[in-house]
Each structure stands twice: as C-alpha cells, then as structure tokens.
Curated annotation (Swiss-Prot):
Stimulates the secretion of gonadotropins. The modification Pyrrolidone carboxylic acid is found at residue 27. Belongs to the GnRH family. GO terms for molecular function: gonadotropin hormone-releasing hormone activity; gonadotropin-releasing hormone receptor binding. It comes from the Eukaryota. It is found in: Secreted. This is Progonadoliberin-1. Residues 1-26 form the signal peptide. Its main location: secreted. Keywords: Amidation, Cleavage on pair of basic residues, Hormone, Pyrrolidone carboxylic acid, Secreted, Signal. The lineage of its organism: Eukaryota, Metazoa, Chordata, Craniata, Vertebrata.
Length: 96
C-alpha cells in the first residue's frame, strides 16, 4: 500500500516539475523582429545597445579563479562595437 502511494506521489511530482521547469528555463529575445523572424537592420544597433546596457560595467579583471586577466564583459563591449560598425556599413550600402 505504501509503495502505491509512493509511486503516485513521485508521478505527481515528476509531472509538476516536468511542466514547470521548461517554462522557466527558456528565454525569448524578440527585439526588432519582423514577421518571419527577420530583423530590420536599422534596429539591430539599437538592439545591441539595449542588450549590452543590461550588463554591469566591470573595470577590474575578474579574479574568482585566479587565472582571469580580462573582464568577462570586455569581449561583449568589443563585439558590440564590431557589430555596430557592420550594421552601419550595411545601412550605408543599402541607402546608396
């Protein structure tokens, strides 16, 4: 009798966890998306600005593990500048 109750309880917990976890593990980014999932080029640089502004600015290197020489966010800032220059170049070629 106790075994049947344990199986039912376990089944309910697995069902509950199986339905709640996927809803909280997924994140959807939809900045500047048009129907069909296509991005507008003029809004891409604004999108990158919005995303990168969410990260805190870290001036000193991260030394949690003792081997990091560079801030983990430094690459994000460099990538923002690189992608911004590409989108600006793309906008200039389309306007010609």
């Amino acid at each position: 009798m106790h075994r049947k109750m344990a199986v039912k309880t376990l089944s309910v917990w697995l069902l509950l966890v199986g339905t709640l976890v996927p809803q909280h593990c997924c994140q959807h980014w939809s900045y500047g998306l048009s129907p069909g999932g296509k991005r507008q080029l003029d809004s891409l640089s604004q999108t990158l600005g919005n995303v990168v502004e969410e990260f805190p600015r870290v001036d000193s290197p991260c030394s949690v593990l003792g081997g990091a020489e560079e801030s983990p966010f430094a690459g994000i800032y460099r990538m923002k500048g690189f992608l911004g220059s590409i989108t600006d170049r793309g906008n200039r070629t389309q306007n010609i």
